[in-house]
């Protein structure tokens, strides 16, 4: 007979984790406040996603966002939640959202030293069919002494202080990194808290899954076509890779992190500069994947090395297990040499 309690009495919640990280860094507490505010927004979005059908939050709000996507009602709600929560942390000066054409400058009385770039609801085209969706964010320090402006957000991903994503799937999960590896937290509905479920996650060196939208195959460049062919018909006679594609980037990236393999959204004839946005889609997930031991590239350089020129700039994105991404880059180099 055991006296072990069915309840954990010393659990590591995400709130506690963030406070401990802040204490170790001997910081001012601003980043701790900011992360806790972001987590509150994520909990609220998670609740809204679960209630969306009953609360009539499905469907289109009747507008198009700055990057050309139809805006769903949940998008609008999620965007407002993140903006209001992080500004009320008194730790931000500039916000960049997928849903807003211009950068949002925090009012002077609420201003702090951090810049937050976020996609409040990634994969929102999947809302109405109940597929997994998510929230993505990256946090930077303001580097100039000037008045806050859009320019403060135009930093390369190497400057990220913390980044993460929330996945609203069969459970709500947060993947977070503050530069010392990646930790995973699951929302416990009974507690209303995120609880640590996996510490210092590492991606496999090589996986068995490739993930991309093959509906665009007619637009692929030669390198992508060759790489996909190699995965389907391996030259060494080994088993082909499995194909998995949700169409919600957070879901596809998280599966790649957990199972290994490769996720591709390369440039193509239709989108020669890529489709995904650098600041609030590519940089945060590239940071997470690199912190987990993987690679993230545009096909020509590491994603985190790209110096942004505009807040809604698009880039190609290929990420995943290091050996898989390296094999893709070999195809790129081979085709460049032959052209």
UniProtKB/Swiss-Prot annotation:
Site entry (Important for the conversion from active R-state to inactive T-state in the presence of AMP), positions: 33
Entry-annotated residues carrying Phosphotyrosine: 216, 219
Ranges for region Important for interaction with ALDOA: 3-10
Annotated residues for binding of Mg(2+) 2: 98, 119, 121
Catalytic activity, reaction form: beta-D-fructose 1,6-bisphosphate + H2O = beta-D-fructose 6-phosphate + phosphate
Compartments, record wording: Cell junction; Cytoplasm; Nucleus; Cytoplasm, Myofibril, Sarcomere, Z line
UniProt keyword annotations, A-Z: Allosteric enzyme, Calcium, Carbohydrate metabolism, Cell junction, Cytoplasm, Disease variant, Gluconeogenesis, Hydrolase, Leukodystrophy, Magnesium, Metal-binding, Nucleus, Phosphoprotein
KW Magnesium (keyword) present: yes
Enzyme class: hydrolase
Positions annotated to bind substrate: 122, 213-216, 245-249, 265, 275
GO molecular function: fructose 1,6-bisphosphate 1-phosphatase activity; identical protein binding; metal ion binding
InterPro entries documented for this protein: FBPase_C_dom (IPR044015), FBPase_class-1 (IPR000146), FBPase_N (IPR033391), FBPtase (IPR028343), Fructose_bisphosphatase_AS (IPR020548)
Residues that coordinate or bind Mg(2+) 3: 119, 122, 281
Recorded consequence of changing residue 21 to E: Reduces sensitivity to AMP
Motif Nuclear localization signal mapped to chain: 204-208
Listed CDD domains: FBPase (cd00354)
Impact after mutating residue 115 to M: In CORLK; decreased activity; decreased sensitivity to allosteric inhibition by AMP; decreased thermal stability
Tissue: Expressed in skeletal muscle (at protein level).
Subunit annotation: Homotetramer. Interacts with ALDOA; the interaction blocks inhibition by physiological concentrations of AMP and reduces inhibition by Ca(2+). Interacts with alpha-actinin and F-actin.
Cross-referenced NCBIfam families: PRK09293.1-1
Additional note from the record: Specific for the alpha-anomer of the substrate.
HAMAP family per record: FBPase_class1
Name used for this protein in its record: Fructose-1,6-bisphosphatase isozyme 2
Protein species of origin: Homo sapiens
């Amino acid at each position: 007979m055991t006296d072990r309690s069915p309840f954990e009495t010393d659990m590591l919640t995400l709130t506690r984790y963030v406070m401990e990280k802040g204490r170790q860094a001997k910081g001012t507490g601003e980043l701790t406040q900011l992360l806790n505010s972001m987590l509150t927004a994520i909990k609220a979005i998670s609740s809204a996603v679960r209630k969306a059908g009953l609360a009539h939050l499905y469907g289109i709000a009747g507008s198009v966002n700055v990057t050309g996507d139809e805006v769903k009602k949940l998008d609008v709600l999620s965007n407002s939640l993140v903006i209001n929560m992080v500004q009320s942390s008194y730790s931000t000066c500039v916000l960049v959202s997928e849903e807003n054409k211009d950068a949002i400058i925090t009012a002077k009385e609420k201003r702090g030293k951090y810049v937050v770039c976020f996609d409040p609801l990634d994969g929102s085209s999947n809302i109405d069919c109940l597929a997994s969706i998510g929230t993505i964010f990256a946090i930077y320090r303001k580097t100039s002494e000037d008045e806050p402006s859009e320019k403060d957000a135009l930093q390369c991903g190497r400057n990220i202080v913390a980044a993460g994503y929330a996945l609203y799937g069969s459970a709500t999960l947060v993947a977070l990194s503050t530069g010392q590896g990646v930790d995973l937290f699951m929302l416990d509905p009974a507690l209303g808290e995120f609880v640590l479920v996996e510490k210092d996650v590492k991606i496999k060196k090589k996986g068995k899954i490739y993930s991309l939208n093959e509906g665009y195959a007619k637009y692929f460049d030669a390198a992508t076509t060759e790489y996909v062919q190699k995965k389907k018909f391996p030259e060494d006679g080994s088993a082909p890779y499995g194909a998995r594609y949700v169409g919600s980037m957070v879901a596809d990236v998280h599966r790649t992190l957990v199972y290994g393999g490769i996720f591709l959204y390369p440039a193509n004839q239709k989108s020669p500069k890529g489709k995904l946005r650098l600041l609030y889609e590519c940089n945060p997930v590239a940071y997470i994947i690199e912190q987990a031991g993987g690679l993230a590239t545009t096909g020509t350089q590491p994603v985190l090395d790209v110096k942004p020129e505009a807040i809604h700039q698009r880039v190609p994105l290929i990420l995943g297990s290091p050996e898989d991404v390296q094999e893709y880059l070999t195809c790129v180099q081979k085709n460049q040499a032959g052209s």
